[in-house]
Amino acid sequence: MTTTQLGLQEQSLWSRFCCWITSTSNRLYIGWFGVLMIPTLLTATTCFIIAFIAAPPVDIDGIREPIAGSLLYGNNIITAAVVPSSNAIGLHFYPIWEAHSLDEWLYNGGPYQLIVFHFLIGIFCYLGRQWELSYRLGMRPWICVAYSAPVAAATATLLIYSIGQGSFSDGLPLGISGTFNFMLVLQAEHNVLMHPFHMLGVAGVFGGALFAAMHGSLVTSSLIRETTEVESQNQGYKFGQEEETYNIVAAHGYFGRLIFQYASFNNSRALHFFLGAWPVVGIWFAALAVCCFAFNLNGFNFNQSILDAQGRPVSTWADVINRANIGFEVMHERNVHNFPLDLASGDAQMVALNAPAIEG
């Protein structure tokens, strides 16, 4: 009898926990994905803050010349970063217990893997939590579909690129100037600007910003006034009101006359789908571009593709970009002292045909 009562009590406690986790009445929805999201994001955030402030230098190239990335080792908020794991580690999973000591783990950049893996798990769970809450509320699932674009971009940059290049040392440094360094190296090694997927990503991000500004300004300019001239028009809106807050017919007429008729949407649902889909698809392509770079499917090479009647190359902007890429690549590997393949793969030039005679 006692065993039965304990079982019922435990079941009741578990049922209450399940109801609390999945309740949409909480101020913040937790959900089953949140059970994993909260500890992983807290772990990633805590480790990032500590490493950004106080992590010792990391031997990123695996040649015993460590790079200092934290604030306490002389960096400022612009130059500080969590330095990627050492090239000596490569793609090996490197948790704390794999190192002989904590000092060794820090020297080889262990915090980078800890932060990246926990962060990725956290944002995956955040995506799942968005779907879960939409499901509980009876909403359509497109919010998590839209969020999949930045999740795909983060996954491609932090994980797929490192896997394709064969080492986490090629990953994105977690800092401001480290991000810029990563971008320059990515351009040098993969000709990012000449890749069509990157071009689509740029069109998605900048186009999305343009369309958002156009939509916001049109709506703000065609609000239905519910207040006097001396009051803010925002006071005329009541949360949850059934009436339209702006005149879509006026906005449609204005924009159709400003450009041409069919450039303007006459369906509010189609308009907002377009506003959501354009940047999402663009960022999907940007993530695909990074996945291509990971496996060295680089941008187009149009170097010296135009020749004059004598066969001499006529320089284009593609050649200008190529010269910049070579310069970036020469500066990239600080202590390896290797020439970029563009310079090292040419035919050997004879500098002396006859050795001078040495009089003994």
Swiss-Prot record:
Under HAMAP family, the record lists: PSII_PsbA_D1
* Residues annotated to bind [CaMn4O5] cluster: D170, E189, H332, E333, D342, A344
Q: Where does chlorophyll a PD1 bind?
A: H198
Name recorded for this polypeptide: Photosystem II protein D1 1
Q: Which Pfam families match?
A: Photo_RC
Q: Does the keyword Acyltransferase apply?
A: no
Q: Quote a single Gene Ontology cellular component term.
A: plasma membrane-derived thylakoid membrane
Q: How does it sit in the membrane?
A: Multi-pass membrane protein
Species this chain originates from: Synechocystis sp. (strain ATCC 27184 / PCC 6803 / Kazusa)
Protein family according to the UniProt entry:
Belongs to the reaction center PufL/M/PsbA/D family.
Residues bound to a quinone: H215, S264, F265
Q: Which gene encodes it?
A: psbA1
Tell me which residues bind Fe cation: H215, H272
InterPro entries linked to this entry: D1/D2 (IPR055266), Photo_II_D1/D2_sf (IPR036854), Photo_RC_L/M (IPR000484), Photo_RC_L/M_CS (IPR055265), PSII_D1 (IPR005867)
Q: Where in the cell is it found?
A: Cellular thylakoid membrane
Give me the disulphide-bonded residues: none
- Recorded superkingdom: Bacteria
Question: Residue numbers for the site described as Cleavage?
Answer: A344, S345
Positions binding chlorophyll a ChlzD1 in this chain are H118
Q: For site (Stabilizes free radical intermediate), what residue positions does UniProt give?
A: H190
> Which reactions is this enzyme annotated as catalysing?
2 a plastoquinone + 4 hnu + 2 H2O = 2 a plastoquinol + O2
Q: Which residues form the propeptide?
A: 345-360
Cofactor annotation remark = The D1/D2 heterodimer binds P680, chlorophylls that are the primary electron donor of PSII, and subsequent electron acceptors. It shares a non-heme iron and each subunit binds pheophytin, quinone, additional chlorophylls, carotenoids and lipids. D1 provides most of the ligands for the Mn4-Ca-O5 cluster of the oxygen-evolving complex (OEC). There is also a Cl(-1) ion associated with D1 and D2, which is required for oxygen evolution. The PSII complex binds additional chlorophylls, carotenoids and specific lipids.
Positions with a binding annotation for pheophytin a: Y126
Residue intervals passing through the bilayer:
29-46, 118-133, 142-156, 197-218, 274-288
List keywords of the entry alphabetically: Calcium, Chlorophyll, Chromophore, Electron transport, Herbicide resistance, Iron, Magnesium, Manganese, Membrane, Metal-binding, Oxidoreductase, Photosynthesis, Photosystem II, Thylakoid, Transmembrane, Transmembrane helix, Transport
